[in-house]
């Protein structure tokens, strides 16, 4: 916490994160179209149903009584910036997928996973499997492959390990988690 945050607290001023926490703990956010999910370590996510899918919108930190808008109503990431993406790992991907990452589009199946040692994996699908485009009669399917990139966030919704394409080498996630845990531990 910065000195300015400490002074604001002493003066009784709430931060935006503290105000959002209070709002998200009202009855409105305890029923549809919202859904509360526990992520462990005093953390939770509030999802919102959009176009028939649950989307992770808000990250809740019960330990600090703060909340963060992770994704906005337009399904764009709020706490992630272009600097939080390992662009080198995306260079051989289709241009449409790279464009979605550049636009910070969180439109497809993407999730904040459980917290462990102060960090959580985020899986961000930047290109869906071709079946995504198929209608009820089976028409419209494309030959697209599902593409997910992965990153790690801390309990303040900040990226600590950049999002990158791991080319389905899931052992890489263990390395990324260890790196994220070290970064968070070194801040304490």
Predicted regions: what is each one?
Residues 1-3, 188:
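Short, Lys/Arg-enriched, disordered terminal segments
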Residues 3-11:
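Short linear clamp-binding motif
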Residues 16-187:
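Residue-level detector of conserved, function-critical positions
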């Amino acid at each position: 916490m910065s000195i300015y945050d400490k002074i604001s607290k002493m003066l009784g001023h709430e931060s935006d994160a503290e105000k959002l926490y209070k709002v998200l703990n009202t009855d409105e956010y305890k029923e549809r179209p919202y859904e509360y999910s526990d992520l462990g370590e005093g953390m939770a996510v509030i999802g919102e149903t959009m176009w028939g899918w649950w989307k992770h919108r808000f990250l809740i930190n019960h330990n600090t009584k703060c909340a963060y808008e992770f994704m906005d109503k337009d399904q764009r990431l709020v706490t992630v910036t272009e600097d939080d993406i390992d662009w080198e790992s995306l260079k051989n991907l289709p241009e449409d997928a790279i464009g979605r990452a550049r636009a910070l589009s969180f439109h497809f199946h993407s999730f904040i996973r459980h917290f462990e040692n102060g960090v959580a994996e985020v899986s961000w699908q930047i290109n869906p499997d071709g079946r995504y485009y198929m209608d009820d009669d089976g028409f419209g399917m494309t030959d697209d492959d599902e593409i997910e990139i992965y990153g790690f966030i801390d309990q303040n919704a900040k990226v600590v390990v950049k999002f990158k394409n791991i080319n389905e080498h899931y052992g890489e996630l263990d390395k990324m988690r260890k790196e994220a845990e070290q970064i968070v531990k070194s801040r304490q």
